[in-house]
Amino acid sequence: MPLVACDDSLLTVIDLQPRFWAERLDAEDKRRAEEAARRAAWLAAAAHALGVPAVITEEDPEINGPTDEAVLAPLRASAPVFTKTVFGLADCPEIMAAVRSTRRRTALLAGFETDVCVTHSAVGLGEAGYRVVIVEDAVYSPFGAHLPGIVRLRDLGFELMHCKNVYYDWIRTLPAARAFQEHNPELAHPPGFSL
C-alpha cells in the first residue's frame, strides 16, 4: 500500500460532538474521548494548513449538539457540515456528493463512535471505491467498544494510522516539515505526541 498522498486525501470528521462524551461518560472514558477529540482537532487544523479538504457530519445535532468548536474553527470557511440520520455517511446522497466533489480518492476518518458511525462510514466509502484510512488515535467509542471497533475495522481490511503517521505521509520531506512548523507554530506541538 502506498503512502497517503496529501493531494489525494480527504478528511472526514464524523459526529465529533461534545455531548457524546461531556455528560454520559465516566471519568476514564471522558478523558479518552477528549484526547481523541484533541487529536482530531489537530489533524483538522493540519489538513486545513496543507490544503486537504474536509467534510464534517453531525448526528442529530438537536440532541447531540454541534461539532466540537476546536475542530470547526480551522475548517469553518472551507468544510461543509452535514446533518445525518443514518450511521454511515455513504448512505447520505448529499454527503457523498460533497465527498465526490473533492475528487480525492483517499478518505481519512476521524470522530465518533469507532464501532458504529466510523465503521459504517468506512464500509460505505470502501464499497464506493475509496481508499479508507482510520486515524485510530482520532476516533473513539466508550464503554469498552473502542478496541472491538478498531479490531473489526482492521479485520475488514481498512488501514489504521496514527495522526503522526498521517502528518509524515502528507509532508514527506524534512524541508517540508520545517516549513510547515515555521508557518504553523501552533501545530508544531500536537496533543500527546511529538513531530
Regions found by a protein language model. Name each.
Residues 2-10, 50, 62-195:
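Active-site-adjacent betaalpha module
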Residues 7-9, 24-55:
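A short alpha/beta connector and helix-capping loop motif
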Residues 9-17:
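N-terminal nucleotide-binding beta1-loop-alpha1 segment
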Residues 17-23:
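Short acidic, Gly/Ser-rich segments with clustered Asp/Glu that frequently serve as metal-coordination loops
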Residues 58-59:
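Glycine-rich N-terminal segment of FAD-binding domains in flavoprotein oxidoreductases
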